[in-house]
Amino acid sequence: MVDVYIQGGLRTPIGLFQKQYASMRPEYLGAAILNALKKRYPESHIDDIICGNAVGTGGNIGRLTGLLSDYSEAVPATTIDMQCASASAALGFAFAKIKAGLSENIIAGGIESSSLQPLRTYADKDDRTGSYYVAQFSPDSTDSLAMIRGAERVSQKYQVTQKELYQWTLKSHAKAQKALETGALSPIILEMPGKKDEGIRSKISEKLLSRIPPILGPDSLTSAANSCLTHDGAAFLLLSHQVGEFKICDMAQVAGDPRFSPELVYKATLKLLKKVNLSMSDIDAIEWNEAFSVIDCLFQRYFPEDVNRYNLFGGALAYGHPYGCSGAINLLHVMQALRVQKGRYGLCAIAGAGGVGISFLIERVGV
């Protein structure tokens, strides 16, 4: 089997719903990243482009992205939909193809535009009726709030308090603001004139968060104060058989009860650590996609001694969660955390709608 390395990668600044990328189609965001990677790695012959996307217009939007870029039309492209875990799935397929010797160099990641998410309509003969923005994730539910309800169930199961949830939101924004001020993430963000990570808030407080009403009624916990908003962005990485700065050691994929989908980030992490025979104390930088604050609470419940190495630059509560590319953003952030920390091992994990989860372990080469 072939060792798989990450040569590098980039993401766009992440835009809020209907803000800086309100009218920009996601394939153009993706093409901008592909063009930057082509300039950065001009000698790499690309065998495939694998693109995650969750709420786009359908078709093979990854191929459209490739055709809009400076890469040759002879480079194939595939689109993957695993909802929140789409980019992680794309990276996983790229990892597997290179490891099996089927490809040598693959660009993988994802694109998303919540701002341009189309309204879909069920066919006349479908037993489901009407129009929808949110797809059906499990056989027994067509609820558009399925992910919110999942976060609420996990919050209740682990007896999380509202104060805990607020504290994690505040931590995420504070870390992200510090990273912004120090330029810690600048090496992995494509410079786009007039664009920035729009979600970061420097002036928020628990008092302000407490004014935001819960989504599922007065006795519930989940609200916009402890959930990520909807966003636009793109992120891709170049995976290769050639030695690079980071090696992908292994990955894990899991599935479980869709009603408790946030838990799958923990289960994916646990499976991966068992596969590689490591404990969390061996990991120098950890990224979980914090679509909800309860995911941070899960980390603290299971790994209380490792919180200081968790989401070093803040997470999706601050930056946002452009579903189809979040997994690639997580991997880029953990790579940058390893550079800053001068660490060896990095782990990132993400849960997805429908009760799925994916995790990756990477190693900084030469450490």
PLM feature spans:
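N-terminal extracellular/periplasmic Venus flytrap/periplasmic-binding protein-like
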Residues: R11, S23, Y28-A31, E164-E245, ...
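Short, well-ordered amphipathic alpha-helical segments that serve as non-catalytic structural scaffolds
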Residues: P26-Y41, I61, T65, A90-F93, ...
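Conserved beta-ketoacyl condensing-enzyme motif
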Residues: A22-A85, A89-G92, K97-I98, E104-I106, ...
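Condensing-enzyme catalytic core mediating Claisen C-C bond formation in acyl metabolism
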Residues: M1-M24, K207-E263, K267, K271-K275, ...
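Active-site-proximal alpha-helical scaffold in enzymes
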Residues: I80-E112, S155-L185, L237-Q242, P322-G343, ...
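Active-site pocket-lining segment
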Residues: C249-A318
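Glycine-rich loop/linker segments at domain edges
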Residues: L16, A96-Y158
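Conserved catalytic cysteine-centered active-site region
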Residues: N53-E104, T142-A146, K203-L229, Y302-V334, ...
